[in-house]
């Protein structure tokens, strides 16, 4: 089995993945959302301190799953990029300590690649090549995944990410953190869903394949300020509904532009923000339009987790992509290549 560790942001997670058939044997996770809620977003120093507390607790649960028989382990895998440096280092320190004490090889995994492999948790075979939309609090990307070693970034955000924009709008409306589920619920409760959209769709006439949410966020801020004296629940529902609708329509329009050029046969959606059911339905319709098979990460594995890191690390294990402890390091940025001109 491979023991995998995820600590790139505000989720502490450990998992055990069986090498022979890619089955997830154990998965444990502690979320920090309640600790960051009052701040309206993740506080890096607080996240780091909580990882230092939570990772050892999760390791104790892993020990129970193994019956303290560490001979079952064949490698240690750790997310080392991209993410918050102060949280990545907490996971790496644990991984290096385990690798050294158990004399096991160390695998460094890219967090974005891990999200792609969240589509294949508990599955030995993948459906690569495929294209993938990754939407989360830190990223809005279209990826082309031909195989484990060949994953390219085809489109990215020029400013805020999709999930980050939900968090910021939620904060402006005093609705708490994380913003994704709150805004989705707010939009669901709005009664007048057939009215014209009140915010402009970003990059509607741009020739660039990219995402942008800062202009939409600013339009929402102006609308909130305009209604500030009478910002009742109905007004919040209206703003939430129109914001979500425009944000998702922006994703659809840009992805459709990609579809017209690349014509993918299989398209996956991953990342924490991909739990949004309105988004999922919109992409079902888009894929139907282009006769493209849609694959979705299971809801429980959309947000950051060690299970996806374990699944992706199986590929590295088979290829013996091990890293000496003295060369193991972290990076706040991904090393996946950009191919925006393709």
UniProtKB/Swiss-Prot annotation:
Substrate binds at residues 134-138, 167, 180, 276. It is found in: Cytoplasm. It is an enzyme of class 2 (transferase). GO terms for cellular component: cytoplasm. The keyword Acyltransferase applies. GO terms for biological process: tRNA threonylcarbamoyladenosine modification. Its cofactor is Fe(2+). Pfam families: TsaD. Required for the formation of a threonylcarbamoyl group on adenosine at position 37 (t(6)A37) in tRNAs that read codons beginning with adenine. Is involved in the transfer of the threonylcarbamoyl moiety of threonylcarbamoyl-AMP (TC-AMP) to the N6 group of A37, together with TsaE and TsaB. TsaD likely plays a direct catalytic role in this reaction. This is tRNA N6-adenosine threonylcarbamoyltransferase. It comes from Helicobacter acinonychis (strain Sheeba). The gene is tsaD.
């Amino acid at each position: 089995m491979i023991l995998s560790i995820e600590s790139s942001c505000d989720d502490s997670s450990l998992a055990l993945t069986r090498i022979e058939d890619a089955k997830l044997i154990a998965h444990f996770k502690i979320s920090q959302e309640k600790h960051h809620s009052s701040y309206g977003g993740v506080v890096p120093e607080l996240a780091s301190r909580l990882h230092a507390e939570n990772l050892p607790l999760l390791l104790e649960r892993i020990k129970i799953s193994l019956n303290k028989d560490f001979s079952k382990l064949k490698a240690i895998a750790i997310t080392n990029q991209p993410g918050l440096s102060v949280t990545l280092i907490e996971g790496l320190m644990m991984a290096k300590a385990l690798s050294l004490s158990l004399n096991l090889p160390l695998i460094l995994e890219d967090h974005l690649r891990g999200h792609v492999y969240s589509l294949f948790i508990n599955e030995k075979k993948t459906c690569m090549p495929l294209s993938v939309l990754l939407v989360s609090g830190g990223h809005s990307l279209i990826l082309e995944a031909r195989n484990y070693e060949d994953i390219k970034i085809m489109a990215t955000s020029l400013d805020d990410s999709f999930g980050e924009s939900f968090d910021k709008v939620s904060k402006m409306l005093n609705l708490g953190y994380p913003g994704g589920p709150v805004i989705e619920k707010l939009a669901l409760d709005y009664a007048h869903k057939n009215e014209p959209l009140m915010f402009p769709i970003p990059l509607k006439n741009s020739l660039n394949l990219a995402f942008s949410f800062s202009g939409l966020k600013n339009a929402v801020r102006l609308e909130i300020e305009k209604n500030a004296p009478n910002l009742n629940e109905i007004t919040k529902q209206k703003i939430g509904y129109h914001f979500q609708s425009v944000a998702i329509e922006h994703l659809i329009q840009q992805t459709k532009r990609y579809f017209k050029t690349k014509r993918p046969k299989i398209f996956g959606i991953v990342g924490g923000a991909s739990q949004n059911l309105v988004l999922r339905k919109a992409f079902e319709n888009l894929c139907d339009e282009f006769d493209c098979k849609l694959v979705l990460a299971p809801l429980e594995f959309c947000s950051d987790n060690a299970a996806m890191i374990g699944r992706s690390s199986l590929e590295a294990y088979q290829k013996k992509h091990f890293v000496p402890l003295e060369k193991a390091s972290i990076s706040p940025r991904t090393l996946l290549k950009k191919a925006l001109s393709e």
